[in-house]
Curated annotation (Swiss-Prot):
Pathway: Phospholipid metabolism; phosphatidylethanolamine biosynthesis; phosphatidylethanolamine from CDP-diacylglycerol: step 2/2. The active site is at residue 183. The record marks 182-183 as: Cleavage (non-hydrolytic). It is a peripheral membrane protein. Heterodimer of a large membrane-associated beta subunit and a small pyruvoyl-containing alpha subunit. GO terms for molecular function: phosphatidylserine decarboxylase activity. It comes from Syntrophus aciditrophicus (strain SB). Its EC number is 4.1.1.65. It catalyses: a 1,2-diacyl-sn-glycero-3-phospho-L-serine + H(+) = a 1,2-diacyl-sn-glycero-3-phosphoethanolamine + CO2. The modification Pyruvic acid (Ser) is found at residue 183. GO terms for cellular component: plasma membrane. This is Phosphatidylserine decarboxylase proenzyme.
């Protein structure tokens, strides 16, 4: 199923509910101005679940950001149990105002997806990486390299959505999921990757280069 509509489908039930509430308020309440409240909620929900087009840059070895947000940490010699070799890790914090649709950082085949239940600490805390609810997507590239993305729920975000499955072939910049309301994404890249971002830098999903190898 495609996920290229302007509004992410996960937001449709909320938009319908608020929209119907607005109509009921207009037609059945004497003080119809009250309809402004659900109307505002409807418009905010449309904005929150926006799913804009992105233009992914060219470059065979380029790894792009999986999320809109701010780079909050970079580790250039990291070990993770799901990866066979040491790696570099870039952590990105998404606030409630960012686009929440996530995109594939590099083309390849999804070899493993691992969901872990957990807590809902603020996603900008380092311990959220290990303690919060999270979903790891491991992709093997055509030349055998491993690139992994982990979706991490935050203090408010309590719904991780992942649209891809194991054995799926994915393309860099393709939409693969979303997390509602402020969260964190971490990208694990081959250790030899040249990191192209710095801590504090703002990035866009599917467009901003994170690294190249």
């Amino acid at each position: 199923m495609k996920h290229d509509s302007f509004i992410a489908r996960e937001g449709i039930p909320f938009i319908i509910a608020f929209g119907l509430t607005t109509l009921l308020a207009v037609f059945f309440l004497e003080q119809s101005w009250i309809a402004v409240l659900p109307l505002t909620a409807t418009l905010f929900t449309c904005w929150f679940f926006r799913n804009p087009e992105r233009h992914t840059p060219e470059g065979e070895k380029l790894i792009v950001s999986p999320a809109d947000g701010k780079v909050i940490r970079i580790d250039e010699d990291f070990h993770h149990e799901m990866l066979s070799q040491p790696c570099s890790k870039v952590s990105i914090f998404m606030n409630v105002f960012n686009v929440h649709v996530n995109r594939v950082p590099y083309s390849g085949k999804v070899t493993k997806i691992s969901y872990s239940p957990g807590r809902f600490l603020s996603a900008n805390l380092d311990k959220a990486s290990e303690q919060n609810e999270r979903n790891a997507i491991l992709v093997r590239t055509s030349d055998g390299k491993e690139i992994m993305t982990i979706q991490i729920a935050g203090l408010i975000a309590r719904r991780i959505v992942c649209w891809v499955r194991e054995e799926d072939v994915v393309k860099r910049g393709e939409r693969f999921g979303m997390i509602r309301f402020g969260s964190r994404l971490e990208v694990f890249m081959p250790k030899e990757t040249k990191i192209l971002v710095t801590v504090g830098e703002k990035v866009k999903a599917g467009e901003s280069p994170l690294g190249t190898f």
